[in-house]
């Protein structure tokens, strides 16, 4: 039943990078990590579950904010070492900064420039 998990080339730490892509637009929303349990739960539950390296625990996307990611499709790349999730993003906010996606800065003239607006201030999402 879990043979498909054995096909993934996990890092030495037992993780795999995961790209979350908005299914309707193709926009890359975020990049995170999963361990074997997180990927199995994601497939079973139909909602994104990641591994938080900073907290050292499973993290269900949207568990605090309500901005869950409904997983429509799970793909693996040709090298079997990156996972792609095609998702529907609840609330239109994927980034903890209150933006639609995490890639809101662009390199311009040797410096990072913010080019995407905050849709909802983080303190109103997570509390002060």
UniProtKB/Swiss-Prot annotation:
<protein>
    <recommendedName>
        <fullName>Phosphoribosyl-AMP cyclohydrolase</fullName>
        <ecNumber>3.5.4.19</ecNumber>
    </recommendedName>
</protein>
<dbReference type="GO" id="GO:0000105">
    <property type="term" value="P:L-histidine biosynthetic process"/>
</dbReference>
<comment type="subunit">
    <text>Homodimer.</text>
</comment>
<comment type="similarity">
    <text>Belongs to the PRA-CH family.</text>
</comment>
<keyword id="KW-0862">Zinc</keyword>
<dbReference type="InterPro" id="IPR002496">
    <property type="entry name" value="PRib_AMP_CycHydrolase_dom"/>
</dbReference>
<dbReference type="GO" id="GO:0004635">
    <property type="term" value="F:phosphoribosyl-AMP cyclohydrolase activity"/>
</dbReference>
<feature type="binding site">
    <location>
        <position position="95"/>
    </location>
    <ligand>
        <name>Zn(2+)</name>
    </ligand>
</feature>
<dbReference type="Pfam" id="PF01502">
    <property type="entry name" value="PRA-CH"/>
</dbReference>
<feature type="binding site">
    <location>
        <position position="79"/>
    </location>
    <ligand>
        <name>Mg(2+)</name>
    </ligand>
</feature>
<feature type="binding site">
    <location>
        <position position="78"/>
    </location>
    <ligand>
        <name>Zn(2+)</name>
    </ligand>
</feature>
<keyword id="KW-0028">Amino-acid biosynthesis</keyword>
<comment type="function">
    <text>Catalyzes the hydrolysis of the adenine ring of phosphoribosyl-AMP.</text>
</comment>
<keyword id="KW-0963">Cytoplasm</keyword>
<feature type="binding site">
    <location>
        <position position="77"/>
    </location>
    <ligand>
        <name>Mg(2+)</name>
    </ligand>
</feature>
<dbReference type="GO" id="GO:0008270">
    <property type="term" value="F:zinc ion binding"/>
</dbReference>
<dbReference type="InterPro" id="IPR026660">
    <property type="entry name" value="PRA-CH"/>
</dbReference>
<feature type="binding site">
    <location>
        <position position="102"/>
    </location>
    <ligand>
        <name>Zn(2+)</name>
    </ligand>
</feature>
<keyword id="KW-0460">Magnesium</keyword>
<keyword id="KW-0479">Metal-binding</keyword>
<dbReference type="InterPro" id="IPR038019">
    <property type="entry name" value="PRib_AMP_CycHydrolase_sf"/>
</dbReference>
<feature type="binding site">
    <location>
        <position position="81"/>
    </location>
    <ligand>
        <name>Mg(2+)</name>
    </ligand>
</feature>
<keyword id="KW-0368">Histidine biosynthesis</keyword>
<comment type="pathway">
    <text>Amino-acid biosynthesis; L-histidine biosynthesis; L-histidine from 5-phospho-alpha-D-ribose 1-diphosphate: step 3/9.</text>
</comment>
<dbReference type="GO" id="GO:0005737">
    <property type="term" value="C:cytoplasm"/>
</dbReference>
<dbReference type="GO" id="GO:0000287">
    <property type="term" value="F:magnesium ion binding"/>
</dbReference>
<keyword id="KW-0378">Hydrolase</keyword>
């Amino acid at each position: 039943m879990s043979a498909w998990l054995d096909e993934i080339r996990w890092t030495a730490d037992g993780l795999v990078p995961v790209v979350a892509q908005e299914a309707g637009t193709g926009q890359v929303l975020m990049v995170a990590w999963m361990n074997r349990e997180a990927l199995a739960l994601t497939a079973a539950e139909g909602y994104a579950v990641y591994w938080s390296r900073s907290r050292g625990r499973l993290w269900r996307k949207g568990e605090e904010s309500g901005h869950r990611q409904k997983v429509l499709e799970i793909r693996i790349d040709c090298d079997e070492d990156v996972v792609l999730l095609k998702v529907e993003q609840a609330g239109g906010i994927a980034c903890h900064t209150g933006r639609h996606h995490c890639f809101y800065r662009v390199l311009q003239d040797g410096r990072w420039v913010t080019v995407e607006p905050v849709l909802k201030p983080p303190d109103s999402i997570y509390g002060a």
